[in-house]
């Protein structure tokens, strides 16, 4: 009976040992499986967060690149605007200078036209005076032996004769002309007269051409009377 009891105890011990082993193995397997599950979950979560982190970094990089591109584009736009403003300023200066030159040219044209009109009027008046001189000269020629010769440049040469009693055909001449201002100029007297400047000033004041010719003849007559 005691032998049977020992066998039962041994059998119980063996059974308990096997149960303990199976329990430990099962617990270990369950723990390992749970650990693997937790590890997988943790790994999956880590991968998800890493992916989000990486996506965030990529997004930040793209944002920075986009911001840098915008900054660069803004600089280019500012440079273009600056260049455009400079060109516009140059154009404004050019237009202003062009306007000033146009006004100056217009003023010069007006002044030139005025001077041209004055010159034409003076020339017309000179021609009228020359005609009057020629008429007066005809009368003087008939009465006083005066000859009038037309020279180049609207100049007239007055030749007096019948002055020297010893030689009535001896010529005494003087050249009279009109300048651009329409004033008389007396020059080229042969023989020379000392009172030419006085006669010229007087004719410019009085416009009395007949008196000028009379004074010239008197001066030549006085000069001729001195000839022996």
Swiss-Prot record:
Q: Where in or outside the cell? A: Nucleus; Chromosome, Centromere, Kinetochore
Q: Which Pfam family name is an example for this entry?
A: Spindle_Spc25
Q: Any one Gene Ontology biological process term?
A: cell division
Query: Could you tell me which cysteines form disulfide bridges?
Result: none
Q: Is the keyword Cell cycle in the record?
A: yes
- The answer on whether this UniProt entry bears the keyword Cell division reads yes
Q: Which superkingdom is the protein from?
A: Eukaryota
Q: Which UniProt keywords apply?
A: Cell cycle, Cell division, Centromere, Chromosome, Coiled coil, Kinetochore, Mitosis, Nucleus
Coiled-coil region(s) at which residues? Answer: 61-144
Task: Provide GO CC annotations from the record.
Answer: kinetochore; Ndc80 complex; nucleus
The entry's function note states:
Acts as a component of the essential kinetochore-associated NDC80 complex, which is required for chromosome segregation and spindle checkpoint activity. Required for kinetochore integrity and the organization of stable microtubule binding sites in the outer plate of the kinetochore. The NDC80 complex synergistically enhances the affinity of the SKA1 complex for microtubules and may allow the NDC80 complex to track depolymerizing microtubules.
The record describes its quaternary structure and partners as: Component of the NDC80 complex, which is composed of ndc80, cdca1, spbc24 and spbc25. The NDC80 complex interacts with mis12 and zwint.
Q: Name the protein family.
A: Belongs to the SPC25 family.
Protein name per UniProt = Kinetochore protein Spc25
The organism is Xenopus laevis (African clawed frog)
